[in-house]
């Protein structure tokens, strides 16, 4: 039966007790992580968020009643112990911070009993994720998950402190706002007071932080909750958290400077990792040409090589056909993989097809320097030698080629180089490689909508020298946009914003938005632009992704206390769920039943 803790005050967390406290009385509280009965002695590993502390129950010290209670303890019971800190009676446990001491218990109170948990509360368990998420309150007790959540809190706290010291003001922006076009789907909230009308949960604080710049708050920050109704991936959630900021009277270099110093500060304080400054910069075009990705992983090489000029006159129709259609032929060199079995090469071909390739061509260079190739019969010996030389091919290498439109070739080889690097063990999670990617295209063509859409968002300022092409050649316009990339993952992005009303109007028209639609959706921003707008720029980090990489995890679900799963549901609470008819009536909502075909 559970006992009261009245009259008790915890004096220490478990790992706050040390050898310096030997001989002192302490009161500790937590969960029973493990219990060992040695007959006349009982040992308990007591766990709280700080770690583990060993408790010794000796009948000669605690008395028979207390010893009997200790005998009844089971894993996950919540207990309070008063006792004296003593030197460990047995061998020192070098794996524990408190491994040289223990508490000789004088009193024991059982504050709460526990049923047998559905999985062990230990590190590196093999329990399926859906079970762990269903019992998330238990999962969060495990040290490896707990350390992630604690790290997340530390990153947020340090970020606030750093930016406050840089003159930023933390200002909250609305959670119930207006649905606007562009971007992902909004989560909509029906209004009871205004039947038939809806709020939208913010995809970002973008418009409000720009209006704060119009209002004279020249440095804004917020740890902001954001919502996007889109399909989930390993690094996506329907609700997520941004480190959001905006600055007035700045240019690209000013924003990058603040954020480089922020990143260096966070990595030093949290991980004791030195970030070399300045961080490397690369234009979007260079990143795509060299790595096939706008978020390249720089922990390894395997750069793309454009071999179009070498193969343009060969007899291989796959290559020449791609070039005749305005595409390119590019390849990567998987060093030391020339002896890869055909079965594995076929698996790589299937992988490439998943990214849009029609196939992959390859050259395997044998140790004697001879070649095995899927297209050798279409090439002269001189052409093959020139191709291998251009690829820096050596004995034992595997050369892989894709031929198609540039967008497909980049997509295929960009993904393939990461897949190969993973197979080759080149992705060291302790090696942090940062990169700024700059000068993104202002627009990208949407085949689905048959129009240009904003690559970032419609408030991004074009490069000054490209402004004249907004109407005549939008596909060639570059943006004053920048992403910060870490180990192949975009952890943040931002841009210089449009602050002239006429340029913003031209941007809307380039996106196919009429003046009427633009005013309907963004009139509040355009009105603010009428009364003096400072040049401004900003950036937002995905806090979840940043902490995921810092914690060396593979999924952001491991660094979020209560995450959703891939169908955007919560296994802990069973949200989303049906609501009763009265609630729907109050919101003027009627649910139509799906019609079934007879």
Regions found by a protein language model. Name each.
Residues 1-598:
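Class II aminoacyl-tRNA synthetase catalytic cores and aaRS-like
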